[in-house]
Amino acid sequence: MEFILSLIGSLLLIICVLVSVAFLTLLERKVLGYIQIRKGPNKVGLMGIPQPFCDAIKLFTKEQTYPLLSNYLSYYISPIFSLFLSLFVWMCMPFFVKLYSFNLGGLFFLCCTSLGVYTVMVAGWSSNSNYALLGGLRAVAQTISYEVSLALIMLSFIFLIGSYNMIYFFYYQIYMWFLIILFPMSLVWLTISLAETNRTPFDFAEGESELVSGFNVEYSSGGFALIFMAEYASILFMSMLFCVIFLGCDVFNLLFYVKLTFISFVFIWARGTLPRFRYDKLMYLAWKCFLSFSLNYLLFFIGFKILLFSFLLWIFFSKKLMEN
């Protein structure tokens, strides 16, 4: 019975994520419209609200192209696997009851994000197009560079809370958010999240001016739609993770979802206002700035834990000596 309830809960979570992805695309088009002093989609239904469903019908009913020189199987499997990973990683979202509560949620998240690199690489390689391959290679180099800092920051928090289980973030932030005490780290995490999800100013995988849309240039119809559904599901997940780690992990509170929406809005806002980085500056930022920053924080948290432990030991032994 418990397994059936968990299964129903997982299906509901996936359906809610997919619906959220649809409306996130609408929010993005509306926000970008107002940033560029225009209306955005407003013709379909009331204020353009049913627009995402019309887009989905249009994309999935268009003709599927078959590039003659592509590696057929990997070309079609990679968008499906990409979306599967983006939905699968939601399983580590912290719940109190009736859904999987991973004791190793942090580790599971790192594994899923590491696998996400391969889908972009295979999608670029299997298209047998030079532009797609270049886009794939740039995406792999970028993601590897940023995942090192991402993993180190995640490890810092694991040392701080003493568990891989995400639900511990809720217990540690009942009285004060980590955003207040670790503000520089939150800014770095947000920047790494932008790079991880291939968003502006780090969207080198799909630079239109340089790579003719990048690794997805040969995709059309359903394959193209699946790639972008995976991207927007990742944006929502990284927004959720930011709220869990820094803004109090109160998943049963309506305010949590308001915070999640705001962080998603920040992703879109960054796209509307910031220009694309230069590639060498991106690498400099990843290896010279963020890596040293995250290593320093990791060492600080380890040292902090050792200091606390030694202080407790000193109190314990001093009490023993006083008793004797």
From Swiss-Prot:
Membrane-topology annotation of the record: Multi-pass membrane protein
Pfam families documented for this protein: NADHdh
PROSITE patterns linked: COMPLEX1_ND1_1 (PS00667), COMPLEX1_ND1_2 (PS00668)
Keyword line: Electron transport, Membrane, Mitochondrion, Mitochondrion inner membrane, NAD, Respiratory chain, Translocase, Transmembrane, Transmembrane helix, Transport, Ubiquinone
EC code(s) of this entry: 7.1.1.2
Record GO biological process: aerobic respiration
Family according to the record: Belongs to the complex I subunit 1 family.
Main function: Core subunit of the mitochondrial membrane respiratory chain NADH dehydrogenase (Complex I) that is believed to belong to the minimal assembly required for catalysis. Complex I functions in the transfer of electrons from NADH to the respiratory chain. The immediate electron acceptor for the enzyme is believed to be ubiquinone.
Name this protein carries in UniProt: NADH-ubiquinone oxidoreductase chain 1
Organism: Drosophila yakuba (Fruit fly)
